[in-house]
Amino acid sequence: KNKPIFVSLTNSYHGETIGALSVGDVELYKDTYEPLLIQSIQTPVPKDMSLEAAKEAAQKFEELCKNRSDEISAIIVEPLIQAAGYMHMYHPHFLELLRDICDRYDVHLIADEVMAGFGRTGKLFACEHANITPDFLVLSKGITGGYLPLSVVLTSNDVYAKFYCDYLEYKAFLHSHSYTGNALACAAANATLDLFEKDDVITQNKAKAAYMMEKLKEFEKLDNVLEIRQTGMVSVVELKGYSSDERIGLKVHQYCLEREVLIRPLGHVVYFMPPYVITYEEIDKMMDTTLEAIKQL
């Protein structure tokens, strides 16, 4: 079938090459390249982490599929957390509903777990929180622990079989990349995965995430905090009462940097996404210093 259209969520970000920019929805990154981008459609992301918001957003996507599923090839989502989209989070049930809708309307589900994959959300993959399997799973970052660049796309045997053929049939993908299957990067990935198993990283992460959640409650008491939220080892403090011109996130960043704590706010959103090797003492310093910074505003 000729189904050229990709759907993504509002507020989404998937990278900065042409195809990835085309399905993103963060103006800061894509506006300059708008004339070059591939056609895509955005459907609403759940407005918050509630079950009701998940159902409302899924209904919007189903309405889109009812009208245009003959044109839609796939929907791409960042499971549970929209990282560059101000660390917006939503309920896992949204992924369950998407999986069901995609199955019924013959639309592929692509899960971009470049950020969330390999333990960041409390399970090895974020999709596991919804007990779903996407048609395509995009992975990077955590697969090598950040030591070497490597990305991977996993797909199903069904998709693989569609392109499996004798050479002269020309159904297979005939393109490749210069560094595909880089042996050193793959060795780093294997070593990282060995450590995940040996050190039981997922269990350790769950304990550290629970500790971070307790620390996060101190921020909720502040008058200039709009909301706190957390998924796994991603904790977020969203500030209120400041204009964009005040560059409030930069002020928090500078205060912390002077005290040997490196954080990277997104506008008025301050978040913690530490490496898994962080100690409890380092969590204390990271979050206590940031708390002091916000109190100083």
List where the protein language model places each region.
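Conserved N-terminal phosphate-binding loop of PLP-dependent enzymes in the Aspartate aminotransferase
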Residues: 1-297
